[in-house]
């Protein structure tokens, strides 16, 4: 990662202008922007252009979201009211299960994660966390058995 890039920052939105532009209510804007499945599209694009100054992955199934200006691959993840997970997306959801080897393989293929606290919308703080940081958290037991942690735990780890 380029040293001139900040490791933290804040993405800001004007809720009223977004609501007006989309012709929806302010409440609907808040609901949309605090749903990680929905807002990820927008977060990936803003992080790509404003923070990593790179390009988006060629496809949704690429295994990463952004290629930075140095060629490093990054995942963008939302810290929602339900927390955040670090395992590959194919391990998350109904009927799917965590697999340690796939998790560690994923970490070997990316530079790390950009974690966005969507619960703080309209000013969403983000943190750039390297894969080696995640591996350290894993080995110290901070990520539990399936690499999903609560929002509170994520914010505590990020504040260290």
Predicted features and spans:
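Nucleic-acid endonuclease domains
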Residues: 1-160
């Amino acid at each position: 990662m380029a040293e001139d890039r900040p490791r933290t920052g804040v993405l800001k939105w004007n809720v009223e202008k977004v609501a007006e532009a989309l012709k929806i209510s302010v409440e609907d804007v808040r609901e949309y922007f605090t749903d990680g499945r929905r807002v990820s599209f927008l977060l990936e694009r803003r992080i790509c252009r404003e923070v990593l100054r790179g390009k988006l992955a060629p496809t949704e199934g690429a295994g990463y979201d952004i290629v930075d200006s140095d060629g490093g691959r990054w995942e963008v993840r939302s810290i929602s009211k339900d927390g955040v997970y670090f395992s590959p997306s194919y391990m998350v959801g109904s009927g799917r299960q965590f697999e340690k080897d796939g998790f560690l393989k994923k970490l070997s293929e990316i530079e790390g994660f950009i974690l966005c606290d969507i619960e703080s919308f309209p000013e969403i703080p983000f943190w750039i966390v390297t894969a080696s940081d995640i591996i350290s958290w894993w080995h110290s037991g901070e990520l539990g058995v399936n690499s999903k942690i609560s929002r509170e735990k994520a914010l505590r780890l990020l504040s260290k």
